[in-house]
From Swiss-Prot:
Claim: GTP-binding is one of the keywords in the record: no
Protein name as catalogued: V-type proton ATPase subunit E 2
Organism of origin: Bos taurus (Bovine)
Family statement drawn from the similarity comment of this UniProt entry: Belongs to the V-ATPase E subunit family.
Function: Subunit of the V1 complex of vacuolar(H+)-ATPase (V-ATPase), a multisubunit enzyme composed of a peripheral complex (V1) that hydrolyzes ATP and a membrane integral complex (V0) that translocates protons. V-ATPase is responsible for acidifying and maintaining the pH of intracellular compartments and in some cell types, is targeted to the plasma membrane, where it is responsible for acidifying the extracellular environment.
Gene symbol of the encoding locus: ATP6V1E2
């Protein structure tokens, strides 16, 4: 039975409505899937960025912490060096004061003569040379000549050797030195410095640990003194 035009139109409309509905459902399905994928991708990107931000700030925090440690270490070292400089300045000041006080020794002729006797004898015993040269300040020549005369028999008694001692009148110690003597071998290759300044310097070096301990107390980081 042939369909009338009206029936054909109805079928066409019905088919078109079905197709449109199916298309709409398909579109909704595509939209839903697209939105789901978008949300998943957005979540992934957000998480990735969050991790990057966390990593960045963790790195920054570590850098800041490292900088703080470096700054603290620098400040501690600066403070330690400042204390060491202050201590060294104090020791230098005390040693300079001691050197100034050495000048008072020579103002006591009797005491200074006894000291020269010992310094000359010590120089002879350290050299153990048959001929020695003694140098002193010009103003000490008389005292040193006397010291030499007393030192020779003592030297001979101790060393069982003879010695010829020449007090140098050509080359002398500077007049502004504190005092004492320098004792040379005859070829002047060996010298014993027994000036008051050199004796003070030697003594201060030998006694520096005790000096530091007396001034600043025992060093907690040092178990023994060298």
């Amino acid at each position: 039975m042939a369909l009338s035009d009206v029936d054909v139109q109805k079928q066409i409309k019905h088919m078109m409505a079905f197709i449109e509905q199916e298309a709409n459902e398909k579109a909704e399905e595509i939209d839903a899937k697209a939105e789901e994928e978008f949300n998943i991708e957005k979540g992934r990107l957000v998480q990735t960025q969050r991790l990057k931000i966390m990593e960045y700030y963790e790195k920054k925090e570590k850098q800041i912490e490292q900088q703080k440690k470096i700054q603290m270490s620098t400040l501690r070292n600066q403070a330690r060096l400042k204390v060491l400089r202050a201590r060294n300045d104090l020791i230098s000041e005390l040693l300079n004061d001691a050197k100034l006080r050495l000048s008072r020794i020579v103002t006591d002729p009797e005491f200074y003569q006894g000291l020269l006797d010992k310094l000359v004898l010590q120089g002879l015993l350290r050299l153990l040379e048959p001929v020695v040269i003694v140098r002193c300040r010009p103003q000490d020549h008389f005292l040193v000549e006397a010291a030499v005369q007393r030192a020779i028999p003592q030297y001979t008694a101790v060393s069982h050797r003879c010695v010829e001692v020449q007090v140098d009148k050509e080359v002398q110690l500077a007049t502004d030195t504190t005092g004492g003597v320098e004792v040379y071998s005859s070829d002047q290759r060996i010298m014993v410095s027994n000036t008051l300044e050199s004796r003070l310097d030697l003594l201060s070096q030998q006694k520096m640990p005790e000096i530091r301990k007396a001034l600043f107390g025992a060093n907690a980081n040092r178990k023994f003194f060298v």
